[in-house]
Amino acid sequence: MTVHPTAIVSPDARLAQGVEIGAYSVIGPGVTVGRNTFLGSHVVIERDTDIGEGCRISSFCSLGGDPQDLKYEGEKTRVIIGNYNVLREYVTVNRATSADIGVTIIGDHNLIMAYCHVAHNCKLGNHIVISNGSHLAGHIHVDDYAIISGMVGIHQFTRIGAHSIIGGASAVTQDVPPYVTAAGNHAKLYGLNLIGLERRGFSKETISALKEAYRIIFRSSSLRREDALEKVRQTVADTPEVRHFIDFIQTSERGVCH
């Protein structure tokens, strides 16, 4: 463990073997940092934050600050960040409010680029990329392998589906289904994320089934949404991916981009 002499570490913080803390960083009470995690200079982890092993937290990140929510009245809440994440310069991650389970969660193997914001009560999965200057409002869920391009703003309580991609400078106000491409202000759908699906090793048969499901649900103007979902169940190959696609759309509370 290496702590720069100018860093300030609370006696209530716990640092594992191999942790490195750069100059002028501040580690507050209730913070745990896992093995071999690197914190650059001027990093602030305010309080009540768990960071896993093998993470790289770049200069001027601010983690574990109070939620930016007028309903927050000082309740004890947390941030949990998993293993092998990279947070670049000036990323901010806020603690949760007491709503839900009272935790802001970031999973494993994620890349969050410079100047991004992850607000209170967000839940991010694994292998996600969030590009420079994108901002997630409160209570957003982002599923595995999603890609959020630069300068994207996402409305609170929105869900971003697995293996989807959102184009740069988009404004997302409704749920983005899994496996799709979305872009624009306000964001609209532009078909499947074919390049991403191919790179992740989805079979031709699975991609073909998803294409047909997408066509029926989003390009059949004569069908109501519920009728389109039922038609997919009856006519499209019953794969786990198609079932997930249908379930995501059917359980949307904000409505989905289309």
From Swiss-Prot:
Gene3D superfamilies: Hexapeptide repeat proteins, Udp N-acetylglucosamine O-acyltransferase, C-terminal domain
Main location: cytoplasm
Protein's UniProt name: Acyl-[acyl-carrier-protein]--UDP-N-acetylglucosamine O-acyltransferase
The keyword Acyltransferase is assigned to this record: yes
Species of the source: Syntrophus aciditrophicus (strain SB)
Alphabetically ordered keywords of this record: Acyltransferase, Cytoplasm, Lipid A biosynthesis, Lipid biosynthesis, Lipid metabolism, Repeat, Transferase
Keyword Oxidoreductase: no
GO BP: lipid A biosynthetic process
Subunit structure: Homotrimer.
GO molecular function terms noted in the UniProt entry: acyl-[acyl-carrier-protein]-UDP-N-acetylglucosamine O-acyltransferase activity
Subcellular location(s) per record: Cytoplasm
Pfam family of the protein (one): Hexapep
Pathway(s) where this gene product acts: Glycolipid biosynthesis; lipid IV(A) biosynthesis; lipid IV(A) from (3R)-3-hydroxytetradecanoyl-[acyl-carrier-protein] and UDP-N-acetyl-alpha-D-glucosamine: step 1/6
GO cellular component: cytoplasm; membrane
Family label: Belongs to the transferase hexapeptide repeat family. LpxA subfamily.
